[in-house]
């Protein structure tokens, strides 16, 4: 399973997503879109918006901290 979290350092909801994944023992790639414009463009292409967090779980894109959607995507 490949998990990416597009976030910024100052976003409280981004920290909630990352804490949630860490608590579940899920490894993920943390991508700081504030420091990486190329990654920010990639995030916008996937999600259609500029807001963070955006979580990509094996191609399922979840905008915001949607616990149920994240759990469903993790379950496959």
Enumerate the language-model features and the residues they cover.
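ATP/adenylate-binding site constellation spanning eukaryotic-like Ser/Thr protein kinases
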Residues: 8, 36, 67
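Conserved beta-strand scaffold positions in the cores of enzyme catalytic domains, especially
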Residues: 25-30, 61
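Local sequence-structure signature of Cys/Sec-based thiol-disulfide redox active-site neighborhoods
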Residues: 1-24
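A short, hydrophobic beta-strand/beta-hairpin element that forms part of a small beta-sheet core
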Residues: 53-61
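Short hydrophobic/aromatic patches at helix-to-coil boundaries
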Residues: 72-76
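Thiol-based oxidoreductase modules, predominantly thioredoxin-like and allied folds used
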Residues: 28-39
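Thiol/disulfide oxidoreductase modules built on the thioredoxin-like
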Residues: 42-51, 63
């Amino acid at each position: 399973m490949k998990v990416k979290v597009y976030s910024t350092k100052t976003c409280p909801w981004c920290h909630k997503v990352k804490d949630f994944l860490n608590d579940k023992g899920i490894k993920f790639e943390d991508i700081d879109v504030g420091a990486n414009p190329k990654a920010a463009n990639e995030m916008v292409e996937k999600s259609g918006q500029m807001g963070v967090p955006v979580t990509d779980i094996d191609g399922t894109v979840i905008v915001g901290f949607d616990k149920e959607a994240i759990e469903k995507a993790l379950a496959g």
